[in-house]
Regions:
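Conserved functional hotspots at enzyme active or ligand-binding sites that engage polyanionic ligands
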Residues: 1-109
Length: 109
């Protein structure tokens, strides 16, 4: 399990209309490898509104169609639900994710 990997999660929340949702791990790698039972993830949606906090992803990342990572909707998920591996972000996409996370969290360099 690594930062930047995408996983399909069945029934991610009781209020979600879909049976499953793809999430990308955004926690730092040392936390992913730690004894903590959860990691921070960003959901992937088929809607892309072109916001600076959204990262376009698609077939290259293992998805069936064009989608986007929504960095404004971070969630904590148990590592135990991240079992259905979908794909991995390229270094270029990981850099775009980092930029979008900085914008979403108002982190200035």
């Amino acid at each position: 399990m690594k930062r930047g990997e995408l996983y399909r999660v069945a029934h991610p929340s009781g209020r979600a209309p879909k049976r499953s949702r793809v999430f990308v791990i955004v926690s730092r790698q040392i936390l992913v490898e730690s004894r903590f039972s959860t990691v921070t993830c960003a959901p992937v949606y088929s809607v892309n509104e072109g916001l600076s906090t959204q990262v376009p992803v698609g077939i290259e990342e293992g998805l069936k169609h064009d989608s986007s990572i929504h960095c404004d909707e971070l969630v904590s998920l148990p590592k135990t639900v991240l079992t259905n591996f979908v794909g991995t972000l390229s270094p270029r996409k990981l850099n775009a994710l980092n930029t979008s996370l900085k914008i979403a969290l108002e982190i200035n360099d």
